[in-house]
């Protein structure tokens, strides 16, 4: 039987992130310095966090979760990002391009075609 304090902490973390109510999850490659200079990746991460909050996309109604990934295994023309469940992979995720992705894809539901490197939506098994 799990420790009740651990169960409560997990429940609180799940509630805080609104898990189960998220519509999209953005993973951004940050770190390692292979696909982009580490400082550029960190700048993009800070921008993504700030803009998701400003746009109200990370709250329960916004429905977007974000995760910093160490490596998404496409080590060229980064930072690389992927938006699930859409399965849309993006290259060159600078703050300027992230703003385009935020407005077009996450707000309006239209991927930014000139930045897309792959499109592989998740499907139910």
Language-model segment annotations:
Residues 18-20, 58-59, 82:
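Solvent-exposed alpha-helices and their adjacent loops that cap or buttress functional pockets
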């Amino acid at each position: 039987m799990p420790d009740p304090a651990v169960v409560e902490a997990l429940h609180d973390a799940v509630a805080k992130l609104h898990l189960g109510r998220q519509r999209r999850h953005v993973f951004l490659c940050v770190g390692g310095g292979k696909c982009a200079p580490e400082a550029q990746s960190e700048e993009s991460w800070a921008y993504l966090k700030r803009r998701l909050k400003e746009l109200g996309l990370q709250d329960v109604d916004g429905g977007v979760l974000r995760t910093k990934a160490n490596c998404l295994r496409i080590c060229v023309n980064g930072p690389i990002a992927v938006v699930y469940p859409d399965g849309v992979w993006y290259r060159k995720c600078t703050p300027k391009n992230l703003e385009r992705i935020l407005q077009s894809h996450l707000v309006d539901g239209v991927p930014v075609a000139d930045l897309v490197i792959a499109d592989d939506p998740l499907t139910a098994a």
